[in-house]
């Protein structure tokens, strides 16, 4: 039985060392970036969001070291910048937490939090969430997973933030490199009650649910063969490697300029130019 309260990938969290510099970099890559959000003192972090439909990316940075952000800081220390967490959409976080508990995964949370949001008309509102996490030690492919219930969608999916010069529309795949892709994919599939799917080049996909993006586990060598001519410098041997984004490829090519590499029928930003995250723009 698939999880009833978890319905596929909601957003990808890219952990960065300098939050404001990362936001400027993503603006140069043709993304519309939200105003900076600041989380609670307990969380000690801040973020910028890059909104698609029905999902998004989050650039996350530590503003003040706290106990809560210790795992994120440890990730940066060990891996450098890159995809540190993937969020699923939670219909009801309290019920979702009980669902994973029943499957042998003691949940962290649910936890309620919010951050102020400056709306396009200049007024200040709040984005409110209720999240729960699978146990921190359960990190398939080295990436933690959690689920996020949006209590105020209207302060997150703001129409003005959803139009991008690079033509980005939605997440299609989350690419995860690992020496043993099949084992990592099986681990994730068990955690979210999904089936794995073998791909022609030996990679293993795990659908995240509904019409949302798939996870694709593959070796670094397989990733290099999928995207010839794209430098994979800076990627860890095991961890989040990149995002495949459905987009208007011509718009992406124009917006990216010299940062983009034509490969695999689309245009690709190498990890070194994407804050540790490869961005592959493909036809929507």
Which positions does each model-derived feature cover?
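Short acidic/glycine-enriched loop/turn segments that link adjacent beta-strands
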Residues: 41-44
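Glyoxalase I/VOC metalloenzyme domain signal
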Residues: 2-9, 14-34, 52-112, 119-284
């Amino acid at each position: 039985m698939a999880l009833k309260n978890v319905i596929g990938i909601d957003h990808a969290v890219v952990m960065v060392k300098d939050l404001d510099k990362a936001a400027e970099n993503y603006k140069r890559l043709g993304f519309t970036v939200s105003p900076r959000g600041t989380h609670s003192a307990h969380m000690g972090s801040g973020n910028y969001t890059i909104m698609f439909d029905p999902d998004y990316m989050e650039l996350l940075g530590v503003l003040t070291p706290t106990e809560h952000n210790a795992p994120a800081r440890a990730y940066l220390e060990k891996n450098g910048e890159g995809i540190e967490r993937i969020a699923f959409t939670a219909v009801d976080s309290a019920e979702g937490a009980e669902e994973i508990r029943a499957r042998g995964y003691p949940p962290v949370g649910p936890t309620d939090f919010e951050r102020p949001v400056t709306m396009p008309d200049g007024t200040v509102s709040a984005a409110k969430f209720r999240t729960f996490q699978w146990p921190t030690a359960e990190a398939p492919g080295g990436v933690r997973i959690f689920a996020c219930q949006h209590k105020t969608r209207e302060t997150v999916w703001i129409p003005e933030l959803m139009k991008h010069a690079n033509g980005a529309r939605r997440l299609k795949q989350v690419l995860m490199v690992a020496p043993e892709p099949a084992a990592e994919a099986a681990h994730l599939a068990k955690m979210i009650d999904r089936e794995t799917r073998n791909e022609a080049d030996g990679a293993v996909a795990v659908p995240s649910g509904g019409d949302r993006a798939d996870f694709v586990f593959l070796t670094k060598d397989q990733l290099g063969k999928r995207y010839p001519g794209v430098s994979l410098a800076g990627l860890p041997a095991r961890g989040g490697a990149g995002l495949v984004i459905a987009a208007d490829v011509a718009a992406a090519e124009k917006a990216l300029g010299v940062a983009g590499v034509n490969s695999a029928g689309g245009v690709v930003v190498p990890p070194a130019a994407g804050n540790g995250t490869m961005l592959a723009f493909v036809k929507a």
